[in-house]
């Protein structure tokens, strides 16, 4: 609900516009971007518009809230708006050897947790989905992930829900258990889905 935006001009300084109350959560990156904090009485969209200046074309991320975009449009009336993915999508898909190695490592760590599930090292029967989810999360961290982004465990009829939230349902013998989990390891994400 509060605007946080990275403004990347064609030339010049990159700026992270962030609510003042969130500044402590932003890791400073000197030489990469500066931080402009906005207070409760300031209009963050006006700050972004000022940073954009006379930009002729503005690429906007797909996750930008419509309310902020609608406020921004009249503040930069001569600009053309495009989807950021159309501009940087190809760049994001291109990986050097170190990035590929980081992706492989993150995937391999998740694969090891999946193997632990299949081999029974993470017990299922008689335990709740939430307990198994917690075990998967702990194993991802033990395998080198910095953060667990999700650990969905869905037993029986719950497996029909693609983004089920693990709960108090107890897993019974001879039923399908869908496990969808992943996290971030050295800045790169893993994501794996398996049925046990």
Model-flagged regions — what are they?
Residues 1-112:
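A composition/biophysics-driven feature that prefers long, compositionally simple stretches
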Residues 51, 71-76, 120, 135, ...:
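Alpha-helical structural signal in soluble globular domains
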Residues 107-118, 129, 136-137:
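Active-site pocket-lining segments that scaffold enzyme catalytic pockets across diverse folds
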């Amino acid at each position: 609900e509060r605007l946080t935006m990275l403004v990347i001009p064609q030339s010049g300084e990159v700026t992270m516009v962030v609510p003042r109350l969130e500044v402590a959560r932003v890791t400073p990156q000197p030489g990469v971007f500066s931080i402009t904090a906005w207070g409760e009485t300031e209009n963050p969209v006006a700050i972004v518009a000022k940073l954009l200046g006379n930009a002729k074309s503005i690429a906007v991320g797909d996750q930008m809230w419509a309310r902020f975009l609608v406020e921004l449009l009249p503040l930069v009336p001569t600009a053309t708006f495009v989807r950021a993915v159309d501009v940087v999508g190809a760049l994001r898909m291109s990986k050097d050897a170190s990035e590929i190695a980081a992706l492989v490592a993150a995937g391999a760590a998740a694969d090891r947790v999946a193997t632990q599930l299949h081999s029974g090292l993470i017990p299922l029967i008689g335990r709740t989905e939430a307990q198994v989810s917690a075990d998967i999360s702990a194993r991802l961290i033990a395998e080198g992930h910095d953060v667990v982004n999700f650990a969905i465990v869905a037993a029986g009829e719950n497996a029909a829900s693609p983004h089920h939230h693990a709960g108090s349902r107890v897993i019974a013998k001879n039923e399908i258990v869908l496990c969808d989990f992943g996290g971030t390891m050295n800045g790169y994400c893993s994501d794996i889905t398996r049925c046990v």
